[in-house]
Every structure is written in structure tokens, then in C-alpha cells.
């Protein structure tokens, strides 16, 4: 797939309790922040939060299926979680190509993930794919 600077893509996902449970079964991430409401209530989050891997997983789908597209993998990324994600949130990943290597099939993306309120929950300062 040919990509150009300025090209954009978007992908959304509404997260459910089943997503959280399935992710835990697959990865073993049974952190009480995701399953124990009494435990979570005593933390800065005050309620159950979704595993970060579900948020970053949306990025992998975006890169592999949308921009640049099939066959693409992350070579490197640097992200920062800026807010928690909760069950019921709809998260949206937006990617934009900011540079394309002149001689290799490599590009740099700017990616942000927001929730339905418009609040940013994850920022990627740089991602090479």
C-alpha cells in the first residue's frame, strides 16, 4: 500500500465487560483494578478500569487493517496514557501519516485515542510502521 503525508484513518470500539473478561483470559491480566469494584474504589480511579492492552490493541488493528494496511506491523512506538478507559466507553483511534521514508516502506504516524466525550486517553508521540 502506498501512503502519503497527511493521509488519515480512524477506528472505533465500544468496550464491554466481556472485552475485559476475554482479555484477562487470554493474557492473565486479572488486576483487581479491572474486576474488584471495592478495590478500585480505593484507588485514584474510584471505579473499575479497562486494561490498557485493550486500548493499545485498537492501535494494532488500525495499523494492520487501515493505515498503512494489511501486512503492516509496528516497528516502534512510544505512547502515554492520559486518562483511564472504563467499561462502556467508546474509544476512537485517529492516525495521520507525518512522514514517509524515501527508500523503504516505512512511515511515521501521529496517533491519538479519545473517548466518546472527546477526552484524549492515549497519545503516541511517535510510531514507526
Ranges and model annotations:
Residues 1-50:
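Catalytic strand-loop segment that frames the active site of acyl-thioester-processing enzymes
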Amino acid at each position: 500500500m502506498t501512503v502519503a503525508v497527511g493521509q488519515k484513518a480512524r477506528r472505533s470500539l465500544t468496550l464491554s465487560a466481556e472485552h475485559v473478561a476475554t482479555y484477562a483470559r487470554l493474557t492473565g491480566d486479572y488486576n483487581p483494578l479491572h474486576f474488584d469494584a471495592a478495590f478500585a474504589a480505593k484507588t485514584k480511579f474510584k471505579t473499575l478500569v479497562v486494561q490498557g492492552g485493550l486500548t493499545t490493541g485498537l492501535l494494532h488493528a488500525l495499523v494492520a487493517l487501515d493505515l498503512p494496511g494489511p501486512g503492516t506491523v509496528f516497528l516502534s512506538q512510544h505512547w502515554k496514557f492520559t486518562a483511564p478507559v472504563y467499561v462502556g466507553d467508546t474509544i476512537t483511534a485517529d492516525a495521520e501519516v507525518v512522514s514517509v521514508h524515501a527508500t523503504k516502506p516505512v512511515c511515521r504516524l501521529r496517533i491519538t485515542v479519545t473517548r466518546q466525550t472527546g477526552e484524549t486517553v492515549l497519545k503516541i508521540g511517535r510510531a514507526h510502521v
